[in-house]
Curated annotation (Swiss-Prot):
Disulfide bonds: none
Location within or outside the cell: Host cytoplasm
Organism in which the protein naturally occurs: Cowpox virus (strain GRI-90 / Grishak)
Name of the protein in its database record: Kelch repeat and BTB domain-containing protein 1
Start and stop residues of the Kelch repeats: 252-297, 298-346, 347-395, 397-441, 442-492, 494-539
Function: Probable substrate-specific adapter of CUL3-containing E3 ubiquitin-protein ligases which mediate the ubiquitination and subsequent proteasomal degradation of host target proteins.
One cellular component term from this protein's GO annotations in UniProt: host cell cytoplasm
Record bears the keyword Repeat: yes
Matches recorded under InterPro entries: BACK, BTB/POZ_dom, Kelch-typ_b-propeller, Kelch_1, SKP1/BTB/POZ_sf, Vaccinia_A55R
Keywords attached to this entry: Host cytoplasm, Host-virus interaction, Kelch repeat, Modulation of host E3 ubiquitin ligases by virus, Modulation of host ubiquitin pathway by virus, Repeat, Ubl conjugation pathway
Subunit structure: Interacts (via BTB domain) with host CUL3.
Record domain BTB: where: 21-88
């Protein structure tokens, strides 16, 4: 004999013939012959049992009638070199028995089998099992499978076996795979109906109430399993006082607009949360130095340069709902580049920039309402400028920094309302080409150029502006200085990505930790190589149901959108 497999085969032959066997495993009326030494080498349970005088050395039987005979027999066969034959039907019993007998290699093999075969058909069953036996590895994996397949599972026969504690955990999770928060109450109601359990305030608190449509809130009010509970109605009567909720990960899509390394085309990329990668969903011919604004899930790109040396007045758009380009949009009043783009609930705004005729700066702000045949003059800034930060907050247009006459940066901060322009606290330093975002009631800016005279110092500064106190706060700096990066807010976090650093396109991204006031490089949002990200926008999924009138069977109507 020259290998262990031959030795194991010989020892198993001894067992089958009863040779040298010194212990019998008794399970009800069944007996399994074995050797103490072999069992002790494979099982911590048997090792302790046989070595610490738990049974007399002359005792030839161990009673394990509380265990499943077939599982014990399969595991002892496994100890003697016979592979486990695992199925979805027996793996739970074998794993539970292996865990009791503390057979580590069998436990690992069963766990691998379950993790490999987890799917929507068995995830609830395995989740309930793992929760009962405190197997954190399987519990976590099966729970994540439930989150991914939740809308498929609400009609599963096992859905009713989930406990209220489990439902609270599911409905509270940011990764719940719903594209609109209105589906969360549907999940809750389907579970209540399947269990015939009355609703609780704890379950209602799991919903992102501020994101629900009026139709779904009415559906909650009118459902018997909710309306019959006084505490639930009291809670729903006070939802106006609840804090603003943040969308779940899958209820928005991160869409980036930039220039790809493939023939320098405009590239529209979508972030794949499952793969943690950016995937290009569309592209078109080259353009740069354009402004971007988003209205009704349509991304508008205004002005800039195309493949000619001249600035453009063309406006194109990408519809994220239909995944199609729109070209029949009225042109700007004149060609311009390096301008700012904004949108409110009705209009697209094109702000400042450089005019084509003589490369002069412009102060004009034009706006366009979709369906209108032309752009109209709206206002003028106090001074011509380009490459400034722009933001829409509380109905006001804010213009931040920028490049003014003489190719110098400015530190001005001004806002435009119906009453005209208002000056605010100046920036701590003169800046341009920074990224801007509104988050949690404040304006954040990052990167760009800074300094007072020559525009040539790439910045890693991050600042926030509080409009209530009219003050700027300096936050922790970026790890990588960058100009024209994209700054975005998603899931109550700030991210910055892309841009140009040291004259080279950077594909790095960073995430801001508010509690620690620090930026960390974010490997999950790394951009494609040589990709300049102009802007990143969280796009909220929209459904036709949002314009539907309420009816008594509205939740059934909502259910018809599952899978669309």
């Amino acid at each position: 004999m020259n290998n262990s497999s031959e030795l194991i085969a010989v020892i198993n032959g001894f067992r089958n013939s009863g040779r040298f066997c010194d212990i019998n495993i008794v399970i009800n009326d069944e007996r399994i012959n074995a050797h103490r030494l072999i069992l002790s080498g494979a099982s911590e349970y048997f090792s302790i049992l046989f070595s610490n005088n738990f049974i007399d050395s002359n005792e030839y039987e161990v009673n394990l009638s509380h265990l499943d005979y077939q599982s014990v027999n399969d595991l002892i066969d496994y100890i003697y070199g016979i592979p486990l034959s695992l199925t979805n039907d027996n793996v739970k019993y074998i794993l539970s028995t292996a865990d009791f007998l503390q057979i580590g290699s069998a436990i690992t093999e069963c766990e691998k089998y379950i993790l490999k075969n987890l799917c929507s058909r068995n995830c609830i069953d395995f989740y309930i099992y793992a929760d009962k036996y405190n197997n954190k590895k399987i519990e976590s994996a099966s729970f994540n499978t439930i989150l991914r397949n939740i809308l498929r599972l609400i009609n599963d026969e096992n859905f009713k076996y989930l406990t209220e504690e489990s439902m609270i955990k599911i409905l509270s999770d940011d990764m719940l795979n719903i594209k609109n928060e209105d589906f969360a109450p549907l999940i809750l109601i389907k579970w209540l109906e399947s269990t015939q359990q009355s609703c609780t305030v704890e379950l209602l608190r799991c919903l992102r109430i501020s994101l629900l449509s009026p139709q779904v809130i009415k559906s909650l009010y009118s459902h018997q399993l909710v309306s019959s509970i006084y505490e639930c109605i009291t809670f729903l009567n006070n939802i106006a006082f609840l804090d603003e909720s943040f969308p779940r990960y899958h209820s928005i899509e991160l869409i980036s607009i930039g220039i790809s390394n493939s023939h320098d085309k405009i590239s529209i990329n979508c972030y794949n949360h499952k793969k943690n990668t950016w995937e290009m969903i569309s592209s078109r011919r080259y353009r740069c130095s354009f402004a971007v604004a988003v209205l009704d899930n349509i991304i508008y790109m205004m002005g800039g340069y195309d493949q000619s040396p001249y600035r453009s007045s063309k406006v194109i758009a990408y519809n994220t709902c239909t995944n199609s380009w729109i070209y029949d949009i009225p042109e700007l009043k004149y060609p311009r580049s390096n301008c700012g783009g904004l949108a409110d609930d009705e209009y697209i705004y094109c702000i400042g920039g450089i005019r084509d005729q003589d490369s002069s700066l412009t102060s004009s702000i034009d706006r366009w309402k979709p369906s209108k045949p032309y752009w109209q003059k709206y206002a003028k800034m106090r001074e011509p400028k380009c490459d400034m930060g722009v933001a829409m907050l509380n109905g006001l247009i804010y213009v931040i920094g920028g490049i003014v006459k003489g190719d110098t940066c400015t530190d001005a901060l001004e806002s435009l309302s119906e009453d005209g322009w208002m000056k605010h606290q100046r920036l701590p330093i003169k800046m341009s080409n920074m990224s801007t975002i509104v988050h949690d009631g404040k304006i954040y800016i990052s990167g760009g150029y800074n300094n007072s005279s020559v525009v040539n110092v790439i910045s890693n500064l991050v600042l926030s502006y509080n409009p209530i106190y009219d003050e700027w706060t300096k936050l922790s700096s970026l790890n990588i200085p960058r100009i024209n990066p994209a700054l975005w807010s998603a899931h109550n976090k700030l991210y910055v990505g892309g841009g140009i650093s040291d004259d080279v396109r950077t594909n790095t991204s960073e995430t801001y930790d508010k509690e620690k006031d620090c930026w960390t490089l974010d490997n999950g949002h790394v951009l494609p190589r040589n990709y300049i990200m102009y802007k990143c926008e969280p796009i909220k999924h929209k459904y036709p149901l949002e314009k539907t009138q309420y009816t008594n069977d509205f939740l059934k109507y909502l259910e018809s959108f599952i899978g669309s």
